[in-house]
Amino acid sequence: DVYKRQIHFTAPVFVFMVVFFLLGFVFYSGLYAALGAMVNSEDEGQQFQTPLIVFFILGYFIMFTVARNPDTVRAFWISLVPFFTPLVMFARIAVSDPILPSGTFLSIFVMILSTILLIWVVSKIYRVGILMYGKKPSFKEALKWIRYK
């Protein structure tokens, strides 16, 4: 039965969980840093953070689906989406028997690459966003900030 799967908590599982936690923390911190550079007050920040919360909650619900069938092709591809990787990989690693190293290391690689790219984009937004204090940007304007030199 799908609901009677055993959770395997061994040393490698723990190490991978720490790695995905740290990568997810840095990734979402970068997203919130970009958000902080674009807003001037807490009220504006609450308005802009809704999409970030939706991605996180969506990943949370997807995690339960993946926990039922962690070795499917769909679970593999979902685990490569950086917004969902930290949560989905917790489920895949804990429930899969054995841990599939190729998918796990590929997820780590994609997460590292997307985090580096995100930090680069956030640094551009932050540089311009700090200078534009008092002006409420749109999403389209934030994309223009990325292209500024």
Which functions belong to the PLM regions below?
Residues 2-3:
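Short, small-residue-biased leader/transition segments that mark boundaries at the very start
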Residues 7, 65-80, 84-112, 149:
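Membrane-interfacial helix-loop-helix junctions in multi-pass membrane proteins
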Residues 12, 43-77, 84:
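Transmembrane helix segments
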Residues 15, 97-128:
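Alpha-helical transmembrane segments of multi-pass membrane transporters/translocases
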Residues 18, 22-54, 69:
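A structural motif at transmembrane helix-loop-helix junctions in multipass membrane proteins
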Residues 21-26, 61, 80, 111-116:
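Residue-level hotspots within the lipid-embedded alpha helices of multi-pass solute transporters
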Residues 34, 38, 113-149:
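Junction motif at the cytosolic side of a transmembrane helix
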Residues 39, 43, 70-71, 94, ...:
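Membrane-interfacial segments
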